[in-house]
Amino acid sequence: MGHIDVSDLAYALPDGRPLLREVSFRVGQGAKAALVGPNGGGKTTLLRLIAGELAPSAGKIATTGGLGVMRQFTPGDRTVGQLLLSVAPPQIKAATAALARAEAALTGASESQLAYAQAISDFTDAGGYDLEVVWDACTTVALGLPYEQVRDRPAGTLSGGEQKRLMLEALLRGPDHVLLLDEPDNYLDIPGKQWLEERLQATTKTVLLVSHDRRLLAGAADRIITVESGTVWVHGGGFATYPAARRDRAARLDQLRRRWDDEHARLRRLVHTLRQRAAANDAVASSYQAARTRLARFEEAGPPEPPPREQNIRVRLRGGRTGKRAVTCQRLQLADLTRPFDLEVWYGERIAVLGANGSGKSQFLKLLADPSSVPHHGTVRLGARVTPGHFVQTHTRPDLRDRTPDEIITTDFGTTLNDAMRALARYELAPTRRQPFHTLSGGQQARLQILLLELSGCTLLLLDEPTDNLDLASAQALQDGLTAYQGTVLAVTHDRWFAEDFDRYLVFDPDGTVHSSATPTWQVNNRTPGT
């Protein structure tokens, strides 16, 4: 079994800014701990420090039992086999690479044959073939096909949820006793989230996960570790009691700070009074020096930790008037995904697109954003003055990857730097203005994408899982912004809380039919792959 022990950890960003300080906590054997906190607060960085991908500025990290790591984002240029290998133990990754090199160098010479035989032996000793048996079970459960049939299949042909489910199966069934999971519920449909909650409850592995899904946190986490203001604090209870515990802690910190301020003011007044008296009476000089010393020591110790600052994110999506029919679909059929369906979307409607992973929801939004990008039959038309803006589920934006937020806004929208900074500040992104897009946290990338949609003035919002990487405050700000938006919204979501405020629901059924519903219908069965 395994555990995680973090002691007095500190980490500074490459530009020297401190991100984490005096971070200490322990996740004991079999515990399920959740890291929560604002986007960009350091949750993913903390996971990377524990995984050994980053070196701390100070402090120590100790783990036992082997680490299985799921990252927040997965490169799309891998095969299914490479996707599974990415969450395998290091010794199996090394043995697999050595075997591939030996196989590539194989000739008729006895030396190369001996090297190949040794590589096979090393792969066996590392547990490679045993793990492939596990992977076979994973692909059979997640994709409905054995490993040998899908190992060379491009992972990009799987939905985001299918990729997540596959990696989670591998980690939960694998040999590592400690799991670090960064947003494991992202892209999972409702049955997938329910499955993950049940598996986390049942596993004997030690788990440290990052999530903003309140239902998953309530059902799977037995302790909450909050990352905010550069450090952490631990709530030993579950998520049900966490909001009250956080309010109580903030009130306690506020009271301690007020007491410190009062004592600081009292000591300063005392020093001031004694200094005046000492000028006229030498007998008071010793009392004056003692008071100065006490004040100096008090100030050197410093004030207590301040209460955490609440986020103030202000989304100002504008939109604009369009034709009455914003979207018209006639006998539309997404190739190999849906049966033909008709749809009319009226100006101003808010429609949530629901259904299981792989049912075609994301492809439908992609089609509306760019009809030439998705194979289909039938017709799809956008109404007069309808300008689509597409929020991409996986945040795959090659056009933004190496660019900084301030440069993106000033260049793409012709604004001044001051205007760009004001816009970034409304989204709590001003501190990241000079960070390349690919270095931002998932939540920061999501907020920046929403800001870019706002600045574009698009009149049709196509949002693919927009709340997946957003913390609770950011998700609420987005919801408030959509309420005030003067345009049309279609949003793919598996977030039941987010979906409650929509006007109607477009449901992609497991059998390929697509229908409209006045109430949310959460499908309980995933589609069979290939159907």
Language model features with spans:
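ABC ATP-binding cassette signature C-motif
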Residues: 1-253, 321-531
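Non-transmembrane amphipathic alpha-helical segments
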Residues: 95-103, 119, 260, 264-274, ...
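Short, flexible active-site-proximal loops enriched in glycine and acidic residues
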Residues: 109, 262, 303-306
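A short, surface-exposed helix-loop junction/capping segment
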Residues: 112-122, 268-278, 310
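Alpha-helical segments in transporter systems
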Residues: 120-123, 284, 312-318
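ABC ATPase nucleotide-binding domains
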Residues: 253-274, 278, 282-293, 525-531
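ABC transporter TMD-NBD coupling linker
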Residues: 291-309
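Amphipathic heptad-repeat alpha-helical coiled-coil/stalk segments that mediate oligomerization
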Residues: 303-328
